[in-house]
């Protein structure tokens, strides 16, 4: 956490954390509170039946799934989320981000969408009983509005149904 804080402060940005309750390590909320962080915004949660998601794929996208975030997944997500202050590969900050994503207590799947050999979008699904939490959904700007995120959601819907 110290490395992440130093990284953002060094880049002139305030460190902030988004916590998805069921996918976060159980000790994270208490650690953030001890370090002086406070909750300042809540997020909306949208729900849909998994069956409604599963049929919305765009055929031209190739979906790959993995139990951990691979290099292409990480590249898409960190580029969209961190842009010009993206953590350098192999740094403590990058390792911390990867470690956080790898630690949910529920079954997790990571997906990427590629077209014409170019990986353009990434997402994460966390199976929670009858629920599938979707987070870290990211599409590179020049590939937006082409069906990549919709196809990722469809793939995650199928995977969520399979994991029930």
List each language-model region with its residue ranges.
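Conserved acetyl-CoA-binding loop-helix of GNAT-fold acetyltransferases
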Residues: 1-5, 136-141, 145-162
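Acyl-donor-binding surface of acyltransferase catalytic domains
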Residues: 2-72, 82-85
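Hydrophobic helix-cap positions at the C-terminus of alpha-helices
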Residues: 7-8, 101-104, 159-160
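Short, high-confidence coil segments that cap the C-terminus of an alpha-helix
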Residues: 12-13, 162-164
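Conserved acetyl-CoA binding element of GNAT-fold acetyltransferases
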Residues: 20, 130-141
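A generic local structural motif
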Residues: 33, 96-99, 153-155
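Short loop segments at secondary-structure junctions
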Residues: 50-53, 116-117, 142
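Flexible, substrate/cofactor-facing loop regions flanked by secondary structure
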Residues: 59-132
């Amino acid at each position: 956490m110290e490395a992440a804080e130093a990284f953002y402060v060094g880049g002139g940005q305030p460190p902030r954390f988004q916590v998805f309750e069921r996918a976060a390590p159980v000790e994270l909320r208490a650690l953030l509170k001890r370090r002086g962080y406070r909750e300042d915004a809540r997020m909306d949660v949208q729900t849909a039946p998994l069956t409604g998601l599963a049929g919305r794929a765009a055929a031209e996208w190739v979906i790959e799934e993995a139990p951990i975030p691979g290099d292409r997944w990480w590249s898409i997500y960190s580029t969209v989320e961190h842009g010009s202050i993206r953590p350098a590969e192999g740094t403590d900050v990058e390792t911390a981000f990867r470690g956080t994503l790898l630690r949910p207590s529920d079954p997790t799947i990571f997906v990427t969408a590629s077209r014409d050999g170019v990986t353009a979008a990434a997402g994460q699904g966390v199976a929670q009983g009858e629920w599938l939490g979707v987070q870290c959904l990211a599409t590179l700007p020049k590939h937006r509005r082409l069906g990549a995120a919709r196809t990722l959601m469809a793939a995650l819907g199928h995977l969520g149904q399979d994991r029930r």
